[in-house]
Amino acid sequence: MTWTVIFTVKAERDLAKLPDDIAKRIILKIETIAENDPYDQLDRMTNSPYYKFRVGVYRGIVNIVNDKMILQLVRARHRSQVCEPHLVKT
């Protein structure tokens, strides 16, 4: 089953600030994750309800809404910035 992918406003802003090729790779990656079981491809963040994935040195932060089969991209940033706790609040 395919999951639905949605983007938060902050994630859309993050993607707009990234180089075009990186933003496209992040979007392609989350769409690929949505086609399969996301739990096999995402890592849970420590002490957080969110999950993460890597695209080179960039990270995507994802919220999974199980009952509706939705993957919500919360943030997409360089790895040095994305794991700061205040950045993943929606």
Model segments located where?
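Enriched for short, Lys/Arg-rich terminal
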Residues: 2-4, 17, 21-24, 55, ...
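Hydrophobic recognition helices of helix-based DNA-binding modules
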Residues: 15-18, 33
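A short, surface-exposed loop/turn module that caps and links secondary-structure elements
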Residues: 29-54
